[in-house]
């Protein structure tokens, strides 16, 4: 059988369940139930419940929307029991437990974080969740950290960091999601003790003020280096996925004038290539929405594990559009399909730790990076795309 997986999840949010939450039922952050969930495969003829006949089978590892081919037979209970299955691009897993473990397509090479060919260092600076425009009680600290970041990018002599000599080797800056803090709850938190809530006009004014600060920040750094600005669900520009680039009308004349040369308003997910040595390296990046939604409907809690599954499924978010709002597209190409394996796959996260792993798929080395939350850690990542190495930059500021 060949079709798409469908996972029935009774804990999936619904209008009536949302009413229960309003009436006092505790809200949940994940909707997976190992006992109640059911796994199906569906095609044009209908939907068939399935189960795996091998010891390592776990239905919680599957989500809806995965292209799948299975081999097996239907038992007397009407369940299709499969012992072999295939994902996109001829990735097989065998019913035998030993073969199942040995046939894992993800091989972690014994490579460390060192230069491979002593090439000239060329860096991309990844900044995730910079969240310009914190609530007032955190504004001073946020501005101070941002000032240190600007000084680092401008390679000012007065910045006290061992990494200042790397600034002139940065070829591109990528702001990966949540560049603007537009979360209403952030503004609510500062006055929650007053049992009051800011009006929509106050929130809109705060968002507008934050856009002005973002404009000033971009104006400072775009005079020095190329910037790619990725949108996210928190920028309130386009809540449908994949997200189009931010509207130019959101930016001042100074920034828009620079935009034609060094400020690139890009999409989310973001696919691009950059020249490395005598070849081009292919990058795929997301602002993390696909990772977050897959976490809610699967057993995976680690961003890197989900990123591996994205590559295995050859899709950034198979679960869309059922659980992640997806805009309709009239051509035959799925915009979230991974048609070519990347050299680097990166994503934004709300996590404190930076996670980095090198894997090999189909004899190709792929680097996975789950970026640290800059607003929580004041950390960003310098990735040397010539030598496949990285450095973590941390800005410390004491009031």
Protein language model annotation of sequence segments:
Residues 1-399:
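Extended recognition/assembly regions associated with phosphoester-bond processing machinery
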């Amino acid at each position: 059988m060949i079709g798409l997986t469908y996972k029935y999840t009774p804990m999936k949010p619904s209008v009536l369940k949302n009413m229960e939450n309003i009436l006092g039922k505790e809200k949940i952050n994940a909707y997976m139930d190992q006992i109640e969930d059911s796994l199906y495969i569906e095609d044009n003829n209908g939907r068939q419940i399935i189960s795996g006949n091998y010891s390592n089978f776990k239905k919680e590892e599957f989500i809806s929307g995965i292209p799948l081919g299975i081999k097996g037979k239907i038992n007397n209970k009407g369940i299709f029991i499969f012992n072999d299955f295939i994902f996109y691009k001829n990735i097989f897993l065998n019913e035998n437990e030993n073969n199942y473990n040995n046939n894992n397509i993800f091989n972690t090479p014994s490579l460390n974080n060192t230069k491979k060919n002593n090439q000239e260092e060329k860096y991309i600076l990844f900044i995730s969740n910079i969240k310009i425009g914190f609530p007032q009680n955190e504004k001073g600290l946020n501005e101070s950290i941002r000032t240190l970041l600007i000084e680092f990018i401008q390679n000012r002599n007065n910045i006290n960091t061992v990494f200042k000599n790397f600034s002139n080797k940065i070829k591109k800056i990528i702001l990966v999601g949540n560049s603007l803090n537009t979360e209403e709850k952030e503004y609510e938190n500062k006055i929650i003790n007053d049992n009051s809530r800011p009006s929509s006009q106050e929130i809109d004014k705060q968002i507008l003020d934050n856009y002005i600060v973002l404009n000033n920040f971009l104006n400072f750094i775009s005079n020095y280096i190329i910037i790619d600005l990725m949108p996210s669900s928190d920028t309130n520009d386009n809540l449908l996925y994949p997200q189009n680039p931010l509207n130019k009308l959101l930016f001042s004349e100074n920034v828009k004038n620079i935009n034609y040369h060094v400020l690139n308003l890009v999409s989310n997910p973001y696919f691009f290539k950059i020249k490395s040595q005598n070849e081009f390296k292919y990058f795929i990046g997301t602002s993390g929405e696909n990772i977050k939604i897959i976490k809610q409907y699967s057993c995976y809690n680690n961003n890197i594990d989900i990123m591996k599954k994205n590559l295995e499924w050859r899709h950034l978010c198979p679960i869309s559009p059922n659980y992640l709002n997806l805009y309709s597209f009239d051509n035959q190409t799925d915009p979230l399909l991974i048609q070519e394996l990347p050299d680097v796959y990166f994503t934004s996260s709300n996590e404190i730790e930076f996670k980095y792993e090198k894997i090999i798929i189909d004899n190709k080395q792929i680097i996975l990076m789950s970026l640290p939350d800059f607003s929580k850690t004041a950390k960003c990542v310098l990735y040397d795309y010539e030598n496949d190495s990285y450095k973590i930059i941390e800005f410390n500021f004491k009031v």
